[in-house]
Amino acid sequence: MKKHIKILKKKLKIYNPKLNEECGVFGIANVKDASALTALGLHSLQHRGQEGCGIVTFDGERYYSEKRFGLVGDNFNKEKVLDNLKGNFAIGHNRYSTTGNNTLRNIQPFFADTNAGGIGVAHNGNLTNSIYLRNKLVEEGAIFYTTSDTETIVQLIAKSKRLKTIDKIIDAIFQIQGGYALVTVSYTHLR
């Protein structure tokens, strides 16, 4: 653990031993108006992150995603925005960047297609071995789009040799270290 913290201090210059609020994650399943309820859930977690917010929904056939800078109440307060996020399943995220740059591409949830189907992922906390895992994945040919350690989780899920999405998630969890919360949404969870 000390080794990973030392690496974070040296390479990323982001380590802050003082208590800071961090991201908030929310998930809801099999309800009408999942996007609106997720926006309300994120609003109740607003104190945990105010840089950006995002929601990924699933309607049984496809995924929908919306990510924006700023507060939940300013971004998910219009019916049109919420109506575009169709589905009865949703995950959401409030961003407070502890790792990665404050850019739109780092706002979660992230979505990826894997050989087992699509998956949406949101996480809060810090992965103490994210630099090691990221370097290992890059050496193995992975291409990263963001500077967020959450993408490391997505890459581990996608790269897993397991056949079922839930097994891919478990495989990824066994590789990451640190304190975190994780929510996912996937079609294969519904079967």
Task: Give names to the regions the model predicted.
Residues 1-191:
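Conserved short alpha-helical segments that host acidic/polar catalytic motifs at enzyme active sites
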